């Protein structure tokens, strides 16, 4: 079984449990995590022992979004010419899109088990999954608007296939939080469980 720096993987009874494993950083998505998600899901897609994949997060939150240190590293890159720096950013975004598309392309059903906060890049991630479930107290937010960014890694392309377009636009324009009960009402999640333990037991 593969081992990863930012993920934990366990396969039992034909269920692959992939857990985001940066709890001290609220599972913020650093560069290694993006690459490992692609490697992991491409492998699980071809694994004959795996019939379903459950994606969850360790610690208090599912995912706090993209690790902003990634962008600091890009901004501080040695490229000084604006055009070259812009092209480098474009190539980085294309790679990140490919990383998450591996979840969407996985040949096995992927179920997201969400607790705590699911923000920004976390929304990109769960919108790639086939089904989403959450615990009471979970919150969802397309936060990119608050830092002057576009949700350009898949949220705006995938969410309109999951929830109504008008709701997608409202959430993208305002960055407001969606609580668990509203997430169920708008169809973002299939069901809400009492707590994280009940969530994982129910989804498994």
Regions found by a protein language model. Name each.
Residues 6, 41-42, 97-100, 123:
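Short hydrophobic/charged patches on amphipathic alpha-helices used for structural packing
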Residues 101-204:
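Crotonase-fold acyl-CoA enzyme core
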Residues 57-99, 148:
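Glycine- (often His-adjacent) and acidic-residue-rich active-site loop
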Residues 1-58:
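Conserved CoA-thioester-binding segment of acyl-CoA-metabolizing enzymes
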Residues 18, 55, 67, 125-127, ...:
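Hydrophobic/aromatic residues within transmembrane alpha-helices
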Residues 32-36, 95, 102, 202:
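Charged catalytic carboxylate motif
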Residues 21, 66, 115:
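Histidine-centered beta-alpha loop that forms part of the nucleotide-sugar donor binding/catalytic region
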